[in-house]
Amino acid sequence: MARYRLGRINEEVKKEISNIIRDDIHDPRLTGMVSVTRVEVTNDLRYAKVFISIFGSDESKTETLEALKSSAGFIRREVGHRVKLRYTPEILLELDESIEHGMHINDLLSNLKEKKRNDNR
């Protein structure tokens, strides 16, 4: 499959899953702020690995991820209705820590810059 087509499919599935999580899932366990950071659909369109970033405590992250995993069948069905593909991919949800990792590195750099500024005084 052409690389650019797979990229378009990834983005379309990502957009629809974001909309589904935001508008259609009414699970009380969804306590943290949830964002879909990226989606990787396999070449045969059978599986979609969905990377989710959850802002909140570790406990709320675990609870929110479990709520989303229990809603995976609903999400798959809705994606099948909204995105016209030969196969509706099976949704595999994974926690994405990259945003928090980036924030941690940014804090470290800020601390170094502040320390350097204080040492020069």
Curated annotation (Swiss-Prot):
Query: Which Gene Ontology MF annotations are present?
Result: ribosomal small subunit binding
Print the keywords alphabetically: Cytoplasm, Ribosome biogenesis
Q: Where in the cell is it found?
A: Cytoplasm
Superkingdom as given in the UniProt entry: Bacteria
Decide whether keyword Zinc is in the record.
no
CC terms in the record's Gene Ontology section: cytosol
Q: Which GO terms describe its biological process?
A: maturation of SSU-rRNA
**InterPro entries annotated for this entry?**
KH_dom-like_a/b, RbfA, RbfA_dom_sf
Q: Name one Pfam family in it.
A: RBFA
What quaternary arrangement does the UniProt entry report? Monomer. Binds 30S ribosomal subunits, but not 50S ribosomal subunits or 70S ribosomes.
Q: Which protein family is named in the record?
A: Belongs to the RbfA family.
**Function description:** One of several proteins that assist in the late maturation steps of the functional core of the 30S ribosomal subunit. Associates with free 30S ribosomal subunits (but not with 30S subunits that are part of 70S ribosomes or polysomes). Required for efficient processing of 16S rRNA. May interact with the 5'-terminal helix region of 16S rRNA.
Q: What is this protein called?
A: Ribosome-binding factor A
Taxonomically, what lineage is the organism? Bacteria, Bacillati, Bacillota, Clostridia, Eubacteriales
As recorded in Swiss-Prot or TrEMBL, the protein's gene is named: rbfA
